[in-house]
From Swiss-Prot:
It comes from the Eukaryota. Pfam families: Pdase_M17_N2, Peptidase_M17. GO terms for cellular component: cytoplasm. One of its GO terms (biological process) is proteolysis. Its cofactor is Zn(2+); Mn(2+). InterPro entries: Leucine_aapep/pepB (IPR011356), NPEPL1_N (IPR041417), Peptidase_M17_C (IPR000819). This is Probable aminopeptidase NPEPL1. Zn(2+) 1 binds at D265, D342, E344. Zn(2+) 2 binds at K260, D265, D283, E344. It comes from Pongo abelii. The active site is at K272, R346. Belongs to the peptidase M17 family.
Length: 523
Protein backbone atom coordinates (compact mmCIF):
# COMPACT_ATOMS: atom_id res chain seq x y z
CA UNK A 1 0.00 0.00 0.00
CA UNK A 2 2.97 2.32 0.53
CA UNK A 3 3.26 3.10 -3.18
CA UNK A 4 -0.45 3.81 -3.67
CA UNK A 5 -1.51 7.29 -4.69
CA UNK A 6 -5.08 8.45 -4.02
CA UNK A 7 -6.78 10.61 -6.64
CA UNK A 8 -10.20 12.20 -6.09
CA UNK A 9 -12.03 13.00 -9.31
CA UNK A 10 -15.52 14.24 -10.15
CA UNK A 11 -15.71 11.47 -12.73
CA UNK A 12 -13.34 8.53 -12.94
CA UNK A 13 -14.32 7.89 -16.56
CA UNK A 14 -15.19 4.62 -18.24
CA UNK A 15 -12.94 1.58 -18.40
CA UNK A 16 -13.11 -2.19 -18.76
CA UNK A 17 -12.81 -3.63 -15.21
CA UNK A 18 -10.26 -6.12 -16.49
CA UNK A 19 -7.91 -3.22 -17.22
CA UNK A 20 -9.01 -1.09 -14.24
CA UNK A 21 -10.50 -3.14 -11.38
CA UNK A 22 -13.45 -1.56 -9.62
CA UNK A 23 -15.11 -1.46 -6.18
CA UNK A 24 -18.57 0.07 -5.81
CA UNK A 25 -19.35 0.85 -2.19
CA UNK A 26 -22.27 2.31 -0.26
CA UNK A 27 -25.30 1.64 1.86
CA UNK A 28 -27.68 -0.77 0.12
CA UNK A 29 -30.54 1.69 -0.28
CA UNK A 30 -28.06 4.14 -1.81
CA UNK A 31 -26.67 1.53 -4.21
CA UNK A 32 -30.19 0.83 -5.45
CA UNK A 33 -30.44 4.50 -6.44
CA UNK A 34 -27.43 4.33 -8.77
CA UNK A 35 -28.73 4.22 -12.36
CA UNK A 36 -27.25 1.57 -14.60
CA UNK A 37 -26.34 4.32 -17.07
CA UNK A 38 -23.85 5.71 -14.56
CA UNK A 39 -21.94 2.47 -13.90
CA UNK A 40 -22.37 0.81 -17.27
CA UNK A 41 -19.21 2.30 -18.73
CA UNK A 42 -17.18 1.08 -15.76
CA UNK A 43 -18.52 -2.49 -15.93
CA UNK A 44 -19.21 -3.36 -19.55
CA UNK A 45 -18.57 -5.57 -21.41
CA UNK A 46 -17.91 -7.83 -18.42
CA UNK A 47 -21.07 -7.10 -16.44
CA UNK A 48 -24.60 -6.76 -17.79
CA UNK A 49 -27.44 -4.74 -16.28
CA UNK A 50 -29.19 -7.96 -15.30
CA UNK A 51 -26.12 -9.17 -13.44
CA UNK A 52 -25.77 -5.78 -11.70
CA UNK A 53 -29.37 -5.89 -10.48
CA UNK A 54 -29.02 -9.53 -9.43
CA UNK A 55 -25.93 -8.70 -7.40
CA UNK A 56 -27.74 -5.91 -5.58
CA UNK A 57 -30.62 -8.25 -4.79
CA UNK A 58 -28.27 -10.76 -3.14
CA UNK A 59 -26.64 -8.25 -0.79
CA UNK A 60 -27.73 -8.63 2.82
CA UNK A 61 -25.48 -6.41 4.95
CA UNK A 62 -25.23 -7.66 8.53
CA UNK A 63 -23.40 -5.42 9.18
CA UNK A 64 -21.70 -5.52 5.75
CA UNK A 65 -21.80 -7.70 2.66
CA UNK A 66 -20.13 -7.92 -0.73
CA UNK A 67 -20.68 -9.64 -4.05
CA UNK A 68 -18.20 -10.17 -6.91
CA UNK A 69 -19.47 -8.89 -10.24
CA UNK A 70 -16.72 -10.22 -12.49
CA UNK A 71 -14.06 -12.62 -11.17
CA UNK A 72 -11.83 -10.56 -8.86
CA UNK A 73 -11.92 -7.47 -11.09
CA UNK A 74 -15.20 -5.89 -10.00
CA UNK A 75 -17.02 -6.01 -6.66
CA UNK A 76 -20.01 -4.30 -5.10
CA UNK A 77 -20.05 -3.95 -1.30
CA UNK A 78 -22.76 -2.77 1.08
CA UNK A 79 -22.30 -0.80 4.28
CA UNK A 80 -24.59 -1.11 7.32
CA UNK A 81 -28.08 0.23 6.64
CA UNK A 82 -28.29 1.80 10.09
CA UNK A 83 -25.87 2.94 12.76
CA UNK A 84 -26.41 3.69 16.43
CA UNK A 85 -26.47 7.19 17.86
CA UNK A 86 -22.83 7.02 19.00
CA UNK A 87 -21.56 6.02 15.55
CA UNK A 88 -20.95 8.05 12.42
CA UNK A 89 -23.77 8.00 9.83
CA UNK A 90 -21.02 7.41 7.27
CA UNK A 91 -20.17 4.03 8.88
CA UNK A 92 -16.56 5.11 8.43
CA UNK A 93 -14.94 2.15 10.18
CA UNK A 94 -16.76 -0.29 7.90
CA UNK A 95 -15.65 1.66 4.82
CA UNK A 96 -12.01 1.12 5.78
CA UNK A 97 -12.58 -2.59 6.41
CA UNK A 98 -14.43 -3.17 3.14
CA UNK A 99 -11.83 -1.34 1.07
CA UNK A 100 -9.06 -3.41 2.65
CA UNK A 101 -10.84 -6.70 2.00
CA UNK A 102 -12.85 -6.09 -1.19
CA UNK A 103 -10.84 -3.74 -3.41
CA UNK A 104 -9.53 -5.86 -6.30
CA UNK A 105 -5.76 -5.93 -6.91
CA UNK A 106 -4.14 -3.97 -9.71
CA UNK A 107 -1.84 -1.07 -10.57
CA UNK A 108 -4.71 1.26 -11.49
CA UNK A 109 -7.98 0.78 -9.63
CA UNK A 110 -11.20 2.67 -9.10
CA UNK A 111 -13.55 3.12 -6.14
CA UNK A 112 -17.03 4.51 -6.66
CA UNK A 113 -18.29 5.72 -3.27
CA UNK A 114 -22.07 6.11 -3.14
CA UNK A 115 -23.26 8.35 -0.31
CA UNK A 116 -25.03 11.57 0.61
CA UNK A 117 -23.24 14.93 0.59
CA UNK A 118 -22.81 15.19 4.41
CA UNK A 119 -20.92 11.85 4.43
CA UNK A 120 -18.37 12.72 1.72
CA UNK A 121 -15.69 14.03 4.10
CA UNK A 122 -15.89 11.13 6.55
CA UNK A 123 -16.00 8.59 3.72
CA UNK A 124 -12.89 10.01 2.05
CA UNK A 125 -10.90 9.98 5.30
CA UNK A 126 -12.02 6.40 5.94
CA UNK A 127 -10.83 5.38 2.48
CA UNK A 128 -7.42 6.93 3.17
CA UNK A 129 -6.91 4.76 6.25
CA UNK A 130 -6.95 1.68 4.04
CA UNK A 131 -3.76 2.81 2.26
CA UNK A 132 -0.89 3.20 4.77
CA UNK A 133 2.31 4.76 3.51
CA UNK A 134 4.94 3.11 5.70
CA UNK A 135 6.43 -0.28 4.95
CA UNK A 136 9.85 -1.91 5.18
CA UNK A 137 8.90 -5.28 3.74
CA UNK A 138 11.76 -6.45 1.56
CA UNK A 139 9.46 -7.32 -1.31
CA UNK A 140 8.04 -3.81 -1.39
CA UNK A 141 11.37 -2.31 -2.45
CA UNK A 142 11.31 -4.44 -5.59
CA UNK A 143 7.82 -3.28 -6.54
CA UNK A 144 8.69 0.27 -7.51
CA UNK A 145 5.78 0.92 -9.87
CA UNK A 146 3.48 3.64 -8.63
CA UNK A 147 -0.08 2.44 -8.13
CA UNK A 148 -3.11 4.68 -8.23
CA UNK A 149 -6.58 4.43 -6.78
CA UNK A 150 -9.06 6.83 -8.36
CA UNK A 151 -12.01 7.71 -6.14
CA UNK A 152 -15.29 8.97 -7.56
CA UNK A 153 -18.23 10.02 -5.39
CA UNK A 154 -21.76 9.41 -6.63
CA UNK A 155 -24.06 11.56 -4.51
CA UNK A 156 -27.62 10.60 -3.68
CA UNK A 157 -30.22 12.44 -1.64
CA UNK A 158 -30.93 16.17 -1.63
CA UNK A 159 -27.57 17.46 -2.88
CA UNK A 160 -26.99 14.92 -5.63
CA UNK A 161 -25.09 17.04 -8.11
CA UNK A 162 -21.47 16.46 -9.14
CA UNK A 163 -18.74 16.92 -6.54
CA UNK A 164 -17.19 20.36 -6.85
CA UNK A 165 -13.52 20.95 -7.62
CA UNK A 166 -13.02 22.73 -4.28
CA UNK A 167 -14.38 19.67 -2.50
CA UNK A 168 -11.98 17.38 -4.34
CA UNK A 169 -9.04 19.58 -3.32
CA UNK A 170 -10.17 19.57 0.31
CA UNK A 171 -10.48 15.77 0.26
CA UNK A 172 -6.98 15.47 -1.21
CA UNK A 173 -5.45 17.67 1.50
CA UNK A 174 -7.41 16.03 4.33
CA UNK A 175 -6.51 12.50 3.26
CA UNK A 176 -2.88 13.51 2.76
CA UNK A 177 -2.96 14.69 6.38
CA UNK A 178 -4.47 11.43 7.58
CA UNK A 179 -1.84 9.39 5.75
CA UNK A 180 0.99 11.66 6.93
CA UNK A 181 -0.06 11.21 10.56
CA UNK A 182 -0.39 7.45 10.12
CA UNK A 183 3.04 7.21 8.48
CA UNK A 184 4.71 9.04 11.37
CA UNK A 185 2.98 6.82 13.93
CA UNK A 186 3.84 3.64 12.01
CA UNK A 187 7.54 4.57 11.73
CA UNK A 188 9.70 3.01 14.49
CA UNK A 189 11.82 5.13 16.79
CA UNK A 190 15.13 4.10 15.23
CA UNK A 191 13.93 6.24 12.31
CA UNK A 192 11.29 8.55 13.83
CA UNK A 193 13.22 10.05 16.73
CA UNK A 194 12.89 13.65 17.90
CA UNK A 195 15.36 14.84 15.25
CA UNK A 196 13.44 13.25 12.39
CA UNK A 197 10.11 14.40 13.79
CA UNK A 198 11.51 17.94 13.71
CA UNK A 199 12.44 17.33 10.08
CA UNK A 200 8.80 16.45 9.39
CA UNK A 201 7.73 19.69 11.08
CA UNK A 202 10.30 21.70 9.10
CA UNK A 203 9.12 20.06 5.87
CA UNK A 204 5.51 21.07 6.51
CA UNK A 205 6.65 24.54 7.56
CA UNK A 206 8.62 24.99 4.35
CA UNK A 207 5.64 23.85 2.28
CA UNK A 208 3.40 26.40 4.01
CA UNK A 209 5.97 29.22 4.17
CA UNK A 210 6.23 29.06 7.97
CA UNK A 211 9.49 29.03 9.94
CA UNK A 212 8.99 26.93 13.08
CA UNK A 213 10.01 28.06 16.54
CA UNK A 214 12.16 25.36 18.14
CA UNK A 215 13.36 25.16 21.74
CA UNK A 216 15.36 22.07 22.60
CA UNK A 217 17.82 20.29 24.85
CA UNK A 218 19.47 22.47 27.50
CA UNK A 219 17.56 25.55 26.36
CA UNK A 220 14.40 23.82 27.56
CA UNK A 221 15.92 23.52 31.01
CA UNK A 222 17.17 27.10 31.00
CA UNK A 223 13.77 28.47 29.98
CA UNK A 224 11.86 26.46 32.56
CA UNK A 225 10.31 23.65 30.53
CA UNK A 226 10.96 21.11 33.27
CA UNK A 227 8.29 18.70 32.04
CA UNK A 228 9.57 18.19 28.51
CA UNK A 229 13.21 18.35 29.57
CA UNK A 230 12.75 15.94 32.47
CA UNK A 231 11.03 13.34 30.32
CA UNK A 232 13.48 13.44 27.42
CA UNK A 233 16.86 14.24 28.97
CA UNK A 234 18.04 10.60 29.14
CA UNK A 235 17.58 9.93 25.43
CA UNK A 236 20.26 10.09 22.74
CA UNK A 237 18.16 12.52 20.72
CA UNK A 238 17.28 15.55 22.86
CA UNK A 239 13.71 16.68 23.60
CA UNK A 240 12.18 19.70 21.91
CA UNK A 241 9.25 22.08 21.89
CA UNK A 242 8.39 23.11 18.33
CA UNK A 243 5.70 25.54 17.16
CA UNK A 244 4.21 26.23 13.73
CA UNK A 245 2.25 29.50 13.71
CA UNK A 246 -0.32 30.79 11.24
CA UNK A 247 -1.28 34.41 11.95
CA UNK A 248 -3.46 35.82 9.15
CA UNK A 249 -4.67 39.41 8.91
CA UNK A 250 -8.13 39.89 10.32
CA UNK A 251 -7.92 37.05 12.83
CA UNK A 252 -10.29 37.52 15.74
CA UNK A 253 -9.04 34.83 18.10
CA UNK A 254 -6.09 32.55 18.78
CA UNK A 255 -6.27 28.77 18.77
CA UNK A 256 -3.54 26.39 19.92
CA UNK A 257 -3.37 22.68 19.12
CA UNK A 258 -0.91 20.97 21.47
CA UNK A 259 0.28 17.47 20.53
CA UNK A 260 2.01 14.86 22.65
CA UNK A 261 5.02 13.64 20.68
CA UNK A 262 6.65 10.88 22.72
CA UNK A 263 8.52 9.14 19.91
CA UNK A 264 9.05 6.12 22.15
CA UNK A 265 7.89 5.34 25.66
CA UNK A 266 9.87 2.75 27.59
CA UNK A 267 8.16 3.96 30.75
CA UNK A 268 11.45 5.40 31.95
CA UNK A 269 12.73 3.95 35.22
CA UNK A 270 9.14 2.86 35.95
CA UNK A 271 9.81 0.62 32.99
CA UNK A 272 7.14 -1.15 30.98
CA UNK A 273 7.11 -4.93 30.63
CA UNK A 274 7.87 -7.00 27.55
CA UNK A 275 4.20 -7.21 26.59
CA UNK A 276 3.26 -3.56 27.12
CA UNK A 277 6.31 -1.86 25.60
CA UNK A 278 5.90 -3.06 21.98
CA UNK A 279 3.79 -0.56 20.11
CA UNK A 280 5.02 2.43 22.09
CA UNK A 281 6.27 4.00 18.85
CA UNK A 282 2.62 5.11 18.62
CA UNK A 283 2.95 7.44 21.62
CA UNK A 284 3.53 10.35 19.24
CA UNK A 285 0.05 9.96 17.74
CA UNK A 286 -1.24 13.26 19.12
CA UNK A 287 1.61 15.31 17.67
CA UNK A 288 1.36 13.44 14.36
CA UNK A 289 -2.35 14.23 14.10
CA UNK A 290 -1.76 17.89 14.92
CA UNK A 291 0.87 18.09 12.16
CA UNK A 292 -1.34 16.43 9.55
CA UNK A 293 -4.35 18.55 10.50
CA UNK A 294 -2.36 21.81 10.60
CA UNK A 295 -1.01 21.20 7.10
CA UNK A 296 -4.48 20.52 5.71
CA UNK A 297 -6.16 23.36 7.60
CA UNK A 298 -3.71 25.99 6.38
CA UNK A 299 -3.78 24.69 2.81
CA UNK A 300 -7.57 25.05 2.80
CA UNK A 301 -7.40 28.54 4.29
CA UNK A 302 -7.79 29.28 8.00
CA UNK A 303 -9.20 32.62 9.13
CA UNK A 304 -7.99 32.73 12.75
CA UNK A 305 -4.59 32.54 14.43
CA UNK A 306 -3.61 28.88 14.67
CA UNK A 307 -0.57 27.52 16.50
CA UNK A 308 0.52 23.88 16.35
CA UNK A 309 2.62 23.08 19.44
CA UNK A 310 4.65 19.86 19.42
CA UNK A 311 5.98 18.44 22.70
CA UNK A 312 8.68 16.02 21.55
CA UNK A 313 10.68 13.63 23.71
CA UNK A 314 11.78 10.02 24.02
CA UNK A 315 11.03 8.57 27.45
CA UNK A 316 14.19 6.54 27.77
CA UNK A 317 16.36 4.91 30.43
CA UNK A 318 19.88 6.06 31.23
CA UNK A 319 22.15 7.55 33.89
CA UNK A 320 20.44 10.91 33.47
CA UNK A 321 16.88 9.59 33.55
CA UNK A 322 14.29 11.12 35.85
CA UNK A 323 13.81 9.05 39.00
CA UNK A 324 10.65 8.50 41.02
CA UNK A 325 10.80 11.02 43.92
CA UNK A 326 12.46 13.67 41.73
CA UNK A 327 10.72 17.05 41.73
CA UNK A 328 10.49 19.10 38.54
CA UNK A 329 9.57 22.74 38.09
CA UNK A 330 7.26 23.03 35.08
CA UNK A 331 6.72 26.00 32.76
CA UNK A 332 3.56 26.91 34.65
CA UNK A 333 5.66 27.64 37.74
CA UNK A 334 4.22 24.65 39.59
CA UNK A 335 6.31 21.85 41.07
CA UNK A 336 5.61 18.18 40.41
CA UNK A 337 6.80 15.22 42.47
CA UNK A 338 7.41 12.28 40.16
CA UNK A 339 5.85 9.10 41.51
CA UNK A 340 5.61 7.34 38.14
CA UNK A 341 7.98 8.04 35.24
CA UNK A 342 5.56 6.19 32.97
CA UNK A 343 3.05 9.02 33.42
CA UNK A 344 5.18 11.25 31.22
CA UNK A 345 2.76 12.49 28.58
CA UNK A 346 0.94 14.79 30.98
CA UNK A 347 4.27 16.36 31.95
CA UNK A 348 5.20 17.39 28.41
CA UNK A 349 1.65 18.53 27.67
CA UNK A 350 1.55 20.59 30.87
CA UNK A 351 4.49 22.57 29.51
CA UNK A 352 2.85 22.77 26.09
CA UNK A 353 -0.52 24.13 27.24
CA UNK A 354 1.19 26.52 29.64
CA UNK A 355 3.29 27.87 26.77
CA UNK A 356 0.15 28.21 24.63
CA UNK A 357 -1.51 30.20 27.39
CA UNK A 358 1.39 32.40 28.52
CA UNK A 359 3.40 32.94 25.34
CA UNK A 360 0.87 32.50 22.54
CA UNK A 361 -2.09 34.13 24.26
CA UNK A 362 -4.43 31.37 23.14
CA UNK A 363 -8.18 31.77 23.63
CA UNK A 364 -8.81 28.09 22.85
CA UNK A 365 -6.32 25.37 23.79
CA UNK A 366 -6.83 21.81 22.58
CA UNK A 367 -4.36 19.11 23.54
CA UNK A 368 -4.34 15.73 21.82
CA UNK A 369 -2.49 12.72 23.17
CA UNK A 370 -2.21 8.98 23.43
CA UNK A 371 -2.34 9.64 27.14
CA UNK A 372 -3.75 6.68 29.09
CA UNK A 373 -4.35 2.99 28.59
CA UNK A 374 -7.46 3.53 30.68
CA UNK A 375 -8.98 5.51 27.80
CA UNK A 376 -9.62 2.26 25.95
CA UNK A 377 -11.49 0.95 28.97
CA UNK A 378 -13.47 4.17 29.41
CA UNK A 379 -14.57 4.78 25.81
CA UNK A 380 -13.29 1.79 23.83
CA UNK A 381 -11.16 1.16 20.75
CA UNK A 382 -13.06 3.38 18.34
CA UNK A 383 -14.03 6.46 20.37
CA UNK A 384 -11.50 8.99 21.64
CA UNK A 385 -12.20 10.46 25.07
CA UNK A 386 -12.90 14.18 25.46
CA UNK A 387 -12.45 16.13 28.69
CA UNK A 388 -13.20 19.85 28.66
CA UNK A 389 -14.18 22.79 30.83
CA UNK A 390 -17.00 23.61 28.38
CA UNK A 391 -20.25 21.67 27.98
CA UNK A 392 -20.76 23.30 24.58
CA UNK A 393 -17.36 22.18 23.33
CA UNK A 394 -17.93 18.70 24.72
CA UNK A 395 -21.11 18.44 22.63
CA UNK A 396 -19.31 19.93 19.62
CA UNK A 397 -16.54 17.32 19.86
CA UNK A 398 -19.06 14.48 19.92
CA UNK A 399 -20.94 15.90 16.94
CA UNK A 400 -17.72 16.57 15.01
CA UNK A 401 -16.69 12.97 15.60
CA UNK A 402 -19.93 11.67 14.11
CA UNK A 403 -19.57 13.99 11.12
CA UNK A 404 -15.95 13.11 10.31
CA UNK A 405 -15.72 9.47 11.43
CA UNK A 406 -13.17 10.11 14.22
CA UNK A 407 -15.58 9.21 17.02
CA UNK A 408 -15.51 10.90 20.44
CA UNK A 409 -17.23 10.30 23.78
CA UNK A 410 -17.06 12.43 26.97
CA UNK A 411 -15.19 11.76 30.19
CA UNK A 412 -16.26 13.03 33.60
CA UNK A 413 -15.08 16.60 34.22
CA UNK A 414 -15.09 17.12 37.99
CA UNK A 415 -11.79 18.56 39.27
CA UNK A 416 -13.16 19.30 42.74
CA UNK A 417 -13.63 15.56 43.29
CA UNK A 418 -10.74 14.14 41.30
CA UNK A 419 -7.72 16.44 41.52
CA UNK A 420 -6.96 15.43 45.11
CA UNK A 421 -5.62 12.20 43.58
CA UNK A 422 -2.40 14.14 42.89
CA UNK A 423 -1.83 15.40 46.44
CA UNK A 424 1.86 15.64 47.39
CA UNK A 425 3.39 16.35 50.78
CA UNK A 426 6.47 18.02 49.29
CA UNK A 427 5.39 19.58 45.97
CA UNK A 428 2.37 21.21 44.37
CA UNK A 429 1.26 17.85 43.03
CA UNK A 430 2.36 14.35 42.06
CA UNK A 431 2.19 13.23 38.46
CA UNK A 432 0.22 10.01 38.92
CA UNK A 433 -2.99 9.21 40.77
CA UNK A 434 -3.15 7.62 44.20
CA UNK A 435 -6.19 5.49 43.27
CA UNK A 436 -6.16 3.99 39.78
CA UNK A 437 -9.83 3.01 40.18
CA UNK A 438 -10.95 6.65 40.34
CA UNK A 439 -11.43 7.71 36.71
CA UNK A 440 -7.71 7.73 35.81
CA UNK A 441 -8.24 9.06 32.28
CA UNK A 442 -10.18 12.04 33.63
CA UNK A 443 -7.54 12.62 36.28
CA UNK A 444 -4.71 12.55 33.73
CA UNK A 445 -6.45 15.23 31.72
CA UNK A 446 -7.09 17.32 34.83
CA UNK A 447 -3.36 17.23 35.59
CA UNK A 448 -2.78 19.01 32.26
CA UNK A 449 -5.57 21.52 32.88
CA UNK A 450 -4.18 22.42 36.30
CA UNK A 451 -1.17 24.03 34.61
CA UNK A 452 -3.35 26.67 32.97
CA UNK A 453 -5.71 26.78 35.95
CA UNK A 454 -9.22 25.47 36.48
CA UNK A 455 -10.45 29.08 36.64
CA UNK A 456 -8.88 30.01 33.28
CA UNK A 457 -11.58 31.87 31.28
CA UNK A 458 -10.70 30.31 27.92
CA UNK A 459 -11.77 27.01 26.39
CA UNK A 460 -9.64 23.97 27.17
CA UNK A 461 -10.25 20.66 25.39
CA UNK A 462 -8.33 17.44 26.03
CA UNK A 463 -8.59 14.52 23.62
CA UNK A 464 -7.18 11.15 24.68
CA UNK A 465 -6.71 9.05 21.52
CA UNK A 466 -4.67 6.17 22.97
CA UNK A 467 -6.85 3.36 21.60
CA UNK A 468 -8.18 4.71 18.27
CA UNK A 469 -4.71 5.85 17.15
CA UNK A 470 -4.24 2.33 15.79
CA UNK A 471 -6.29 -0.58 14.46
CA UNK A 472 -4.37 -3.79 14.98
CA UNK A 473 -0.77 -3.30 13.87
CA UNK A 474 -1.47 -0.21 11.76
CA UNK A 475 -1.86 3.47 12.59
CA UNK A 476 -5.16 5.11 11.66
CA UNK A 477 -4.20 8.77 11.41
CA UNK A 478 -6.90 9.40 13.99
CA UNK A 479 -7.39 13.03 14.96
CA UNK A 480 -6.68 14.74 11.66
CA UNK A 481 -10.27 14.59 10.41
CA UNK A 482 -11.54 15.45 13.89
CA UNK A 483 -9.53 18.67 14.16
CA UNK A 484 -10.48 19.74 10.64
CA UNK A 485 -14.17 19.17 11.36
CA UNK A 486 -14.18 20.61 14.87
CA UNK A 487 -12.61 23.86 13.67
CA UNK A 488 -14.28 23.82 10.26
CA UNK A 489 -16.15 27.06 10.90
CA UNK A 490 -12.81 28.92 10.94
CA UNK A 491 -11.89 27.46 7.54
CA UNK A 492 -12.34 29.19 4.21
CA UNK A 493 -13.34 25.84 2.71
CA UNK A 494 -17.08 25.17 2.16
CA UNK A 495 -16.78 21.42 2.81
CA UNK A 496 -15.13 21.98 6.20
CA UNK A 497 -17.81 24.56 6.96
CA UNK A 498 -20.39 21.87 6.19
CA UNK A 499 -18.93 19.29 8.57
CA UNK A 500 -18.35 21.80 11.36
CA UNK A 501 -20.58 20.99 14.35
CA UNK A 502 -20.75 24.57 15.51
CA UNK A 503 -24.14 26.18 15.54
CA UNK A 504 -25.75 22.78 16.16
CA UNK A 505 -28.32 22.10 18.84
CA UNK A 506 -26.49 20.89 21.94
CA UNK A 507 -27.92 19.06 24.91
CA UNK A 508 -26.49 20.95 27.88
CA UNK A 509 -27.80 21.95 31.26
CA UNK A 510 -28.88 25.56 31.84
CA UNK A 511 -26.13 26.12 34.38
CA UNK A 512 -23.53 24.84 31.94
CA UNK A 513 -24.73 27.29 29.29
CA UNK A 514 -24.35 30.13 31.76
CA UNK A 515 -20.78 29.14 32.54
CA UNK A 516 -19.96 28.64 28.86
CA UNK A 517 -21.20 32.12 28.00
CA UNK A 518 -18.31 33.49 30.03
CA UNK A 519 -15.83 31.52 27.95
CA UNK A 520 -14.54 32.25 24.47
CA UNK A 521 -16.96 31.93 21.59
CA UNK A 522 -16.97 28.90 19.35
CA UNK A 523 -14.91 29.34 16.20
Amino acid sequence: MANVGLQFQASAGDSDPQSRPLLLLGQLHHLHRVPWSHVRGKLQPRVTEELWQAALSTLNPNPTDSCPLYLNYATVAALPCRVSRHNSPSAAHFITRLVRTCLPPGAHRCIVMVCEQPEVFASACALARAFPLFTHRSGASRRLEKKTVTVEFFLVGQDNGPVEVSTLQCLANATDGVRLAARIVDTPCNEMNTDTFLEEINKVGKELGIIPTIIRDEELKTRGFGGIYGVGKAALHPPALAVLSHTPDGATQTIAWVGKGIVYDTGGLSIKGKTTMPGMKRDCGGAAAVLGAFRAAIKQGFKDNLHAVFCLAENSVGPNATRPDDIHLLYSGKTVEINNTDAEGRLVLADGVSYACKDLGADIILDMATLTGAQGIATGKYHAAVLTNSAEWEAACVKAGRKCGDLVHPLVYCPELHFSEFTSAVADMKNSVADRDNSPSSCAGLFIASHIGFDWPGVWVHLDIAAPVHAGERATGFGVALLLALFGRASEDPLLNLVSPLGCEVDVEEGDVGRDSKRRRLV
